[in-house]
């Protein structure tokens, strides 16, 4: 079994660079060999043409194929520091996607409406519960904390989770995702708090791209800041399509795919690539950044029903309940 990676490589000798990647990222130093190396574990170069290099990595070198942290260390690791490689972008990846079991059974006859809690920090428990109540009263489907609001010392995640869960006792089919950003031990503790209260989670990639393997809790992948990894101006970048694939492989339930229209500065094609991957694997693609009823209606006309409109700032201008109703009307029309 293999994981196949498609690279875009800039080098004075692309074939030599391909050899350096394949050998250096599997069994040993590409130029200094020893008698202990086992070629049965070596990565295989399957294609080199112009700047495109395709390499097949053997999954037996990983603990498991979904071990994303070690996989990334393998496919975009030490070769980025050698002089023969000027640029090396991962454009695509081909992996086996495990069977997926949906946790949240949501409406499918229209785009979903999601709300993002504001303010990002400084919120009180009473403000939080009032905002959640108002969103739910308007007919919200999905709510998430902002990625800035994880487990601040002034108002811990455990306190907020308990308060939110009490409100949602009246709205059993609303999915609420607590932000559980944190270092590994802290992340696990926060995820347990959310799970114990019947809530979902969302995590920014800084907490680790390989932390999502937990089928017992709803998990949302938040992309904020991801262009540090995906921007093509980074000579050793990883495409957003690849990141989306790795998130799906781990079993995430929804992915912040990006934005169509609004103030998004990147190429819409990468958003569509992520959207189509989510649809192919029965995951929810969320679109945000400047979302409002007019934008949502325009997007629905372009791509149909299978996505979630995550609304931030606009939802909090005026009456939250009424604004949710306006969003519902826009996606139902």
Regions found by a protein language model. Give the residues of each.
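N-terminal capping/small domains of soluble enzymes
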Residues: 1-136
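Active-site mouth loops of central-metabolism enzymes
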Residues: 6-12, 111-129, 175-186, 229-239, ...
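Structural preference for beta-strand elements that scaffold enzyme active sites
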Residues: 52-54, 112-114, 141-144, 173-177, ...
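Active-site-adjacent beta->alpha loops and helix N-cap segments on the catalytic face
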Residues: 97-106, 149-168, 183-188, 205-223, ...
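Catalytic cores of alpha/beta
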Residues: 125-132, 182-196, 237-250, 290-306
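Conserved, mostly hydrophobic/aromatic
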Residues: 135, 299, 327
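Glycine-rich phosphate-binding active-site loops on the catalytic face of alpha/beta enzymes
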Residues: 138-151, 196-211, 253-264, 289-292, ...
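Conserved anion-binding
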Residues: 198-269
